[in-house]
């Protein structure tokens, strides 16, 4: 027993040094994933402890949305939800593992999916930016309405009271200092038929909503995180309407607070827009997905940016977030089954974190 204790003590400086090297190379090593279903919470907790923590994950963007038993607005709960007890299990394992939780609710855009509204517009249809656009029985893209996802109207006088109560409750139960508001792929904004938004500048509308959320969080010393696509000019860059904006919201980049954390996602190519955000004064993480060759190039890029930029710029390139767009359960399944390397999103995750770990050896 004494020998084991001595070995553990002697190993501590080595482990601490390895951690310092890892943090220096890649301060944020994140995973963005949907929150698990309540019945699978214990399995997800074990996954964090046995798979994520040993690989060096230190940031977990948890897409909760309406998968929580909100007390402030129980009418907005999904049919089955995580309870406070479930959440505290996730909080406990993340604290133990040194993992920062950033809970997420999709705000402004992504208020519907395919044929159904999400809970906010289903319960409060008056918040809909485009009430004349009806949800289809069968969803196809493209379509005559340009419907990808619905948005709430950012100028509706009653929407923010509800949204802010959800934010407060979720950040408190997760004991979180940061909150992710989504804010990606907002196509419906400033519509001509909207009695409040018609004729308004879309960049100003978008910036106004972003700053409003940011300012609310700042009252309790919390920080806003968001996806960066609406802040990129899709026409000038050739990046198009998904990974960038084609409806003029890109000008909002000069209208929003600089302490907002940008999650800069690109999945088809290793586009270098992290440099753009850093030059504008934002802290930024590059977000990758399922093309593991692209993911590796993006990981190498962010390391290179940190090495080769000015001291001021170096500190703005914060790291990598791997995004997983299936259910939490499907990612856990990938680790439980053989031939995990053939599952592309998980392969990208493993490659990125194994690469950073190899570089971190002192």
Question: In which residue ranges do the predicted regions lie?
Answer:
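Bacterial Sec-dependent N-terminal signal peptides
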Residues: 1-21
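Catalytic-core regions of glycoside hydrolase
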Residues: 173, 195-355
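Residues that line or immediately flank small-molecule/substrate-binding pockets and catalytic motifs
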Residues: 8-11, 35, 64, 183, ...
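Aromatic-lined carbohydrate-binding surfaces of glycoside hydrolases
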Residues: 32-245, 252-254
């Amino acid at each position: 027993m004494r020998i084991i204790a001595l070995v553990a003590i002697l190993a501590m400086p080595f482990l601490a040094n390895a951690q310092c090297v890892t943090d220096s190379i890649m301060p944020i090593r994140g995973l963005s994933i949907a929150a698990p279903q309540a019945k699978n919470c214990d399995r997800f907790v074990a996954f964090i402890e046995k798979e994520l923590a040993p690989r060096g994950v230190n940031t977990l963007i948890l897409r909760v949305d309406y998968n929580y038993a909100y007390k402030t607005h129980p009418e907005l709960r999904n049919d089955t939800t995580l309870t406070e007890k479930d959440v505290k299990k996730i909080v406990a394992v993340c604290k133990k593992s040194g993992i920062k939780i950033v809970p997420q609710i999709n705000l402004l855009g992504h208020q519907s999916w395919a044929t159904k509204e999400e809970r906010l517009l289903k319960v409060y249809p008056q918040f809909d930016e485009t009430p004349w656009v009806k949800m289809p029985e069968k969803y196809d893209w493209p379509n005559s309405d340009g419907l990808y996802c619905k948005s709430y109207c950012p100028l509706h006088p009653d929407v923010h009271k509800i949204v802010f109560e959800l934010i407060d409750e979720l950040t408190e139960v997760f004991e979180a200092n940061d909150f992710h508001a989504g804010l990606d792929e907002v196509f419906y904004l400033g519509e001509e038929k909207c009695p409040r938004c018609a004729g308004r500048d879309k960049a100003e509308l978008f910036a106004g909503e972003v700053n409003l959320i940011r300012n609310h969080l700042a009252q309790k010393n919390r920080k806003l995180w968001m996806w960066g696509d609406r802040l990129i000019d899709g026409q000038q860059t050739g990046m198009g309407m998904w990974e960038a904006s084609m409806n003029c919201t890109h000008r909002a980049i000069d209208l929003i607070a600089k302490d907002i954390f940008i999650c800069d996602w690109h999945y088809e190519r290793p586009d270098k827009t992290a440099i753009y955000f850093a030059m504008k004064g934002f802290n930024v993480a590059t977000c990758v997905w399922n093309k593991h060759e692209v993911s590796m190039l993006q990981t190498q890029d962010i390391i290179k940016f940190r090495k080769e930029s000015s001291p001021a710029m170096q500190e703005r390139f914060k790291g990598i977030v791997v995004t997983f767009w299936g259910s939490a359960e499907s990612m856990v399944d990938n680790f439980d089954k053989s031939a995990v390397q053939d599952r592309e999103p998980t392969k990208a995750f493993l490659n990125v974190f194994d690469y950073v770990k190899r570089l971190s050896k002192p």
